[in-house]
From Swiss-Prot:
Signal peptide: none
Species annotation: Methylocella silvestris (strain DSM 15510 / CIP 108128 / LMG 27833 / NCIMB 13906 / BL2)
Oligomer and partners: Part of the 30S ribosomal subunit. Contacts proteins S9 and S11.
Residue ranges of the TM segments: none
Protein name per Swiss-Prot or TrEMBL: Small ribosomal subunit protein uS7
Pfam families for the chain: Ribosomal_S7 (PF00177)
Keyword terms: Ribonucleoprotein, Ribosomal protein, RNA-binding, rRNA-binding, tRNA-binding
GO MF, any single term: structural constituent of ribosome
Gene giving rise to this polypeptide: rpsG
Superkingdom, natural source: Bacteria
Sequence similarity: Belongs to the universal ribosomal protein uS7 family.
Amino acid sequence: MSRRHSAEKREVIPDAKFGDVILTKFMNSIMYDGKKSVAEAIVYDAFDIIEQKARTEPLGVFKQALENVAPAIEVRSRRVGGATYQVPVEVRMERRQALAIRWIITAARGRNDKTMVDRLSAELMDAANNRGNAVKKREDTHRMAEANRAFSHYRW
């Protein structure tokens, strides 16, 4: 990792159907081997299922799920005099979003439903209702930070 220049942020184009930048980032995270059309199909089909089952706006469910999964605080390792401490630190907004997206996708891939569309729609609905593995991951992260609160003065 270069110390001279920080990488410049790339412009993310909003998705075609909803015109949302965060949704594009979500699709890009789902995508394998550059197959964006497959990722788009998975997300849009999952949104259709959410619309049928929840009878609400799927983008609202998606945003609520992201909000419920995003961590406010996490632990980072810090070495002090031969000992490694887990120091709780606040999470930047961009990282919160990235972690929430990653955790939702990981939780969806770990589910036992038949297709990725079913898994993703179920995980998004669960996350929007404060259930599911992605929310559990956030709770674990917060619990870990709370347990290591004594080391918060090592913050950098």
